[in-house]
């Protein structure tokens, strides 16, 4: 009504002091102001409609600075529609704008004699334009062309004259596309004062992170937008992974770093990792990375900054296998105290270690043999040359680790010089030959070496004709040969002498086997007998039958081999024909059938109905809107607001309910998805499952009513009450959640989003599973790294089993994994699983069998149950029925909950590595190989005799190669596990008494 004014006494309440509100800014977030009325002292001159609505007044803040405000209080009249529009605000190329409103609202109940149209809310709108074109009548004062941002409700209203309280609300809108915009405020019957309005936008400040520089970046068009900011490495840094970028989120905060830089060689981090500083002279850094510069190793130096390696001093070297951080070393001094012991044509050399090893521990010895000719006296110098290859060194000539060598097969009456060299890993780097100690010896007269081989020239029923080669080392003139022979079955030996290297043995028995040996003789005596050789005389009937008998095994073997080959060819042909008859789709011709036991209640997916409304009618109760009273907004959901209200059904007492509303302007798909949660909840009836009261679908807005849970979500409830509950109380909460999940699993329902944030708590600390809105189906798009569901939500990586992330295999077993994470959340009082690790780091850690450590004061039995839930093989995880039984036993046996892990909690404790099995838990070597996923080698281990853990613990890489483990990766895995086994054995050795 024209000329209407607020009731007497209300105006003073509409101009309270402006209280400063200090909000912690987001990490690295910047706010740039587009408009702020707080600092305006002259008239704002905004446009109001009608003129009797909003009124501009002056006031003072707490510092007595003048401020301009707008107020309205036409509560005595119904059907109010008062509009207020700001001046034109330039957008500055931003896509999303934030509005901070400071206002006061009077409680309608404190104003006497007012109609029921009094409100405590107002609406925020905006209108885009390319220039300042608005007038008093254009655009029309209504929603559309104006775009509604939100309905603004106060946190606190006031009722007394001296108790005005300032509310601060921040809302955002976008995306914006035109040059600027207007803000508009609609009052529909409130008594309020608009104290200040600030329009601003957010951006991520320029930052240096991970040795990379990222520029100042505007936020995106949506709160969930991620804007890519390309980065560049700082000076003296290099890229270690590409592309190098950082994401700016909608709150102006940097997140999700991709790629990284690190300090180059010769440079170390400085100024809190914002600089890479050159290493000063006398220090170096060999590898790129975040490590510091190090002093030069012994016997090395640098003379300039930014050195990546220190050069060795003169006569000092590094081996090719030495790292840059190794000390420079030198060659060893000669061996000491060489002793020779000659025995005819062989000798033994022994020596002592050099005085100076050159600073290395890879000392080896070489023995150089030289044969000398000529006089050793005054008649002239001797001429020496390298020995022949037939000289034998035991254990070897080069690369000796022992300080003793046996040398044989030398020539008799010959002078030799032996040089014993000391070498190490840098001897090849030195321009000088290895240092050595020499010894001269002369061999004595010696008997000839043994005859190498005997040959059969002919045989008969009574004789054998044999020949042989002369000894390799006759050591003089061969005088004759002596042959020893005897019939193998009798063992009585006879001898015969020959001047030549052949002989015929006569008077032998027919068809008999004889053992023959021969030796040579010089003036020094007989040499050793040759190795025994066996020869056989023929039978008197002739050799034809004997030849046939000798060839019979060959004939039989060839026949059998031919038959086996034919059988293999026939089998292969049959297999190929069978594969041709069975097409590639044969494996899909049979389908699995699910049989449900009589009387068992089974969950029915509402998305299987042709008409989703039919599922709602079948499983949810329709409630008349007159029975519902909305009291206040307590949150916002994906589809609309979440409110607290009351439900009064005929014949029943009034109860508090939580009300989810469907926002205005919904699509049919949004309505279907919104009501699908009611169709799901309506099928459940369990004290630990959130109860559906009903739905309102025949009026607007569409609503879902559930029981009201006073303590809201479990995670925030635990954080607010950190350390306030006993272990028994926490286990009781976990038991309730497990009981609810047991009920769901028995109904064949997979939750897929089990987390503490989706568990609601009532005033009696009863926990109930909620949030059944996650889509049951995931889009099969393997190129999408976020694994988004059909509702657009992302899979909660930190709570999801690895098979569900990798293959989207959601089962009750994957819910068990999530339950283990919920257990960890409860025992840590709402701490974030995996702390500040990125989602990709979490995936990698879980894939490498790392698990969360026990929270502070967590009973060992509970953490073991968590680890059981996090077993990689989903078939080995406990069922929810087993989890409930385990928790019941723990509750009955409270003493078991007093045993806690001694490790610290929180981020200071690393993730637990679950890959090292305790060998004492296995009964056989085969079980151990199965546990480390090397079961394919069980037969190889047993066949080679490694059937006990004591023998396995002594195995080397050569042993693995010998039994058939040829793959380098498998060798490494088995050897690492053997090393762990040795450590465990050392820790559990019994004490001898």
UniProtKB/Swiss-Prot annotation:
Annotated ATP binding sites: 634-642, 660
Catalysed reactions, as listed in the record: L-tyrosyl-[protein] + ATP = O-phospho-L-tyrosyl-[protein] + ADP + H(+)
Assigned GO CC terms: dendrite; plasma membrane
Disruption of the gene: reported phenotype: Mice are viable and fertile and show no obvious abnormal behavior. The corpus callosum, the main axon tract connecting the left and right cerebral hemispheres, is not formed in a significant fraction of newborns. This is associated with defects in guidance of callosal axons across the midline.
Motif PDZ-binding boundaries: 991-993
Annotated transmembrane regions: 555-575
Expressing tissues: Expressed in cells of the retinal ganglion cell layer during retinal axon guidance to the optic disk. Expressed by Paneth and progenitor cells in the crypts of the intestinal epithelium (at protein level). Expressed in myogenic progenitor cells.
Topology of the protein relative to the lipid bilayer: Single-pass type I membrane protein
Active site per the UniProt annotation: 753 (proton acceptor)
Leader sequence segment: 1-29
Every Eph LBD domain range: 31-209
Similarity comment: family membership: Belongs to the protein kinase superfamily. Tyr protein kinase family. Ephrin receptor subfamily.
Name of this protein: Ephrin type-B receptor 3
Organism from which the protein derives: Mus musculus (Mouse)
């Amino acid at each position: 009504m024209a000329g209407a004014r607020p009731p007497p006494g209300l105006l003073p309440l509409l101009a309270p002091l402006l209280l400063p509100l200090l909000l912690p800014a987001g990490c690295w977030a910047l706010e740039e102001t587009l408009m702020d009325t707080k600092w305006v002292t002259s008239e704002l001159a905004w446009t109001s409609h009608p003129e009797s609505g909003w009124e501009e007044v002056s006031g003072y803040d707490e510092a007595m600075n003048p401020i301009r405000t707008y107020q309205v209080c036409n509560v005595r009249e119904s059907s109010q529609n008062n509009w207020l529009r700001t001046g034109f605000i330039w957008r500055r190329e931003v896509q999303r704008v934030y509005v901070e409103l400071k206002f006061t609202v009077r409680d309608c109940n404190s104003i006497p004699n007012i109609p029921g149209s009094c409100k405590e809310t107002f609406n925020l709108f905006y209108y885009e334009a390319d220039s300042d074109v608005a007038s008093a009548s254009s655009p029309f004062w209504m929603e559309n062309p104006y775009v509604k941002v939100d309905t603004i409700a106060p946190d606190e209203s006031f009722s007394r004259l001296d108790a005005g309280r300032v509310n601060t609300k921040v809302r955002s809108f976008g995306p914006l596309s035109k040059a600027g915009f207007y803000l508009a405020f609609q009052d529909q019957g409130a008594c309020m004062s608009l104290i200040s309005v600030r329009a601003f936008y957010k951006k991520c400040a320029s930052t240096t992170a991970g040795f990379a520089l990222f520029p100042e970046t505007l936020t995106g068009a949506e709160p969930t937008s991620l804007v890519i900011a390309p980065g560049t490495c700082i000076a003296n840094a290099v890229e270690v992974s590409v592309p190098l970028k950082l994401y700016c989120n909608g709150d102006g905060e940097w997140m999700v770093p991709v790629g990284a830089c690190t300090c180059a060689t010769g440079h170390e981090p400085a100024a809190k990792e914002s600089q890479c500083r050159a290493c000063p002279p006398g220090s170096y850094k060999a590898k790129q990375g975040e490590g510091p510069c190090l002093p030069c190793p012994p016997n090395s130096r640098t003379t300039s900054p930014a050195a990546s390696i220190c050069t060795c001093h003169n006569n000092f070297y590094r081996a090719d296998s030495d790292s840059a951080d190794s000390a420079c070393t030198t060659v060893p001094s000669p061996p000491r105290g060489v002793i020779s012991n000659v025995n005819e044509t062989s000798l033994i050399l022994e020596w002592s270690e050099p005085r100076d090893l050159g600073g290395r521990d890879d000392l080896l010895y070489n023995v150089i043999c030289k044969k000398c000719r000529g006089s050793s006296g005054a008649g002239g110098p001797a001429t020496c040359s390298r020995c022949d290859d037939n000289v034998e060194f035991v254990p070897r000539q080069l690369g000796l680790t022992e300080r003793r060598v046996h040398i044989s097969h030398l020539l008799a009456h010959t002078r030799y010089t032996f040089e014993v060299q000391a070498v190490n890993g840098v001897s090849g780097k030195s321009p000088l030959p290895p240092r050595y100690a020499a010894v001269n010896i002369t061999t004595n007269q010696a008997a000839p070496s043994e005859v190498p081989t005997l040959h059969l020239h002919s045989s008969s029923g009574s004789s054998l004709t044999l020949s042989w080669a002369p000894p390799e080392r006759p050591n003089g003139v061969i005088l004759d040969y002596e042959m020893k022979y005897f019939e193998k079955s009798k063992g009585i030996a006879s001898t015969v002498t020959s001047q030549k290297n052949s002989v015929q043995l006569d008077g032998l028995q027919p068809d008999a086997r004889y053992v023959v040996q021969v030796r040579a003789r010089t003036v020094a005596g007989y040499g050793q007998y040759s190795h025994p050789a066996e020869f056989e005389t023929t039978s008197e009937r002739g050799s034809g039958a004997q030849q046939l008998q000798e060839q019979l095994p060959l004939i039989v073997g060839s026949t059998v081999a031919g038959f086996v080959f034919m059988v293999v060819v026939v089998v292969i042909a049959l297999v190929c024909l069978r594969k041709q008859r069975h097409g590639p789709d044969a494996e899909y011709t049979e389908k699995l059938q699910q049989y449900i036991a009589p009387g068992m209640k089974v969950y029915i997916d509402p998305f299987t109905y042709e008409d989703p409304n039919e599922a709602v009618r079948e499983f949810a109760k329709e409630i008349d809107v007159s029975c519902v009273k909305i009291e206040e907004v307590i949150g916002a959901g994906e589809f609309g607001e979440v409110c607290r209200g009351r439900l009064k059904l005929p014949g029943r007492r009034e109860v508090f309910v939580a009300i989810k509303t469907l926002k205005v302007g919904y699509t049919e798909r949004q309505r279907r998805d919104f009501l699908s949660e009611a169709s799901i909840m309506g099928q459940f009836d369990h004290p630990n499952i959130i109860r559906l009261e009903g739905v309102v679908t025949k009026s607007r807005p569409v609503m879902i009513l559930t029981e009201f849970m006073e303590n809201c979500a479990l995670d925030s409830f635990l954080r607010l009450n950190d350390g306030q509950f006993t272990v028994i109380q926490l286990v009781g909460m976990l038991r309730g959640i497990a009981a609810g999940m047991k009920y769901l699993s028995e109904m064949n329902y997979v939750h897929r989003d089990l987390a503490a944030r989706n568990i609601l708590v009532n005033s009696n600390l009863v926990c109930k599973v909620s949030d059944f809105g996650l889509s049951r189906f995931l889009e099969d798009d393997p190129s999408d790294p976020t694994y988004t569901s059909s509702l657009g939500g992302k899979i909660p990586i930190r709570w999801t089993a690895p098979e569900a992330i990798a293959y989207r295999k959601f089962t009750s077993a994957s819910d068990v994994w999530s339950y283990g994470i919920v257990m960890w959340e409860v025992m840590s009082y709402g701490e974030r699983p995996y702390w500040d690790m990125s989602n990709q780091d979490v995936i990698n850690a879980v894939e490498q069998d790392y698990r969360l450590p026990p929270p502070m004061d967590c009973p060992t039995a509970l953490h073991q149950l968590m680890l059981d839930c996090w077993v990689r093989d989903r078939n080995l995880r406990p069922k929810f029925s087993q989890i409930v039984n385990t928790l019941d036993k723990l509750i009955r046996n409270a003493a078991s909950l007093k045993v806690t892990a001694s490790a610290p909690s929180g981020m200071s404790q690393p993730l637990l590595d679950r890959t090292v099995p305790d060998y004492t838990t296995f009964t056989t070597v085969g079980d151990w190989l199965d546990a480390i996923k090397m079961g394919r080698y069980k037969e190889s281990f047993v066949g080679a005799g490694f059937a006990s853990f004591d023998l396995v613990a002594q195995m080397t890489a050569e042993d693995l190669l010998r039994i058939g483990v040829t793959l380098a990766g498998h060798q490494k895995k088995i050897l690492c596990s053997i090393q762990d086994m040795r450590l465990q054995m050392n820790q559990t050795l019994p004490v001898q008494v």
